[in-house]
Amino acid sequence: MLGVSLGARLLRGVGGRRGQFGARGVSEGSAAMAAGESMAQRMVWVDLEMTGLDIEKDQIIEMACLITDSDLNILAEGPNLIIKQPDELLDSMSDWCKEHHGKSGLTKAVKESTVTLQQAEYEFLSFVRQQTPPGLCPLAGNSVHADKKFLDKHMPQFMKHLHYRIIDVSTVKELCRRWYPEDYEFAPKKAASHRALDDISESIKELQFYRNNIFKKKTDEKKRKIIENGENEKPVS
């Protein structure tokens, strides 16, 4: 409904001058409406690396963002920023974070970064404003509910631009693991680099796998039934 409203607003803007532009105005309006509806179907893929999962004390140290269409084709690659945090916070990270962020080179990169949290939010907000209409496109990612908590707190303007719903690949993963265990065995394995852009790319590939190998079965079955029913129906003379 929201996507249609966006397209309708675009259509009214062009179609309202119908007397001046005639059929061309209607055609342009239809194209604008279709474009608006298409943009409303986009997904905003985000991954964060944090100093931990405690929302009260931990902070974002890396963020990346990609935009896909509803078919999971990547349309735009956004910023991939490393955010400056005080050494005291890095020194107080858990052993797990120290090991993995140290091994990936992220800890060193955070110490060398000059990008503030406010600057990062501005960059990401500018990017999603160019790529998506306000309030219509959901946040997507793996266990993205955890990222959302930090974004709600530290990047509220960025989150305000997105739809309130999320697309969490980890939910799909857990359902497929329970309902289609034989297919799930072939799901792509994660490299676990614990870097933001790599993690997003892996999440998109994982959801593509579920769509092509699990959701597709039901879609093909439905198409087959429609075709069979259509072929069985005889035209009325």
Swiss-Prot record:
Q: Sites of the modification Phosphoserine?
A: S92
Q: Which residues bind Mg(2+) 1?
A: D47, E49, D199
The entry's Mg(2+) 2-binding residues are D47, D147
What does the record give as the active site? Answer: H194
Q: Which residues carry this modification: N6-acetyllysine?
A: K173
Offer one example of a GO biological process linked to this entry.
nucleobase-containing compound metabolic process
Similarity field: Belongs to the oligoribonuclease family.
Protein name per its UniProtKB record: Oligoribonuclease, mitochondrial
Origin organism is Rattus norvegicus (Rat)
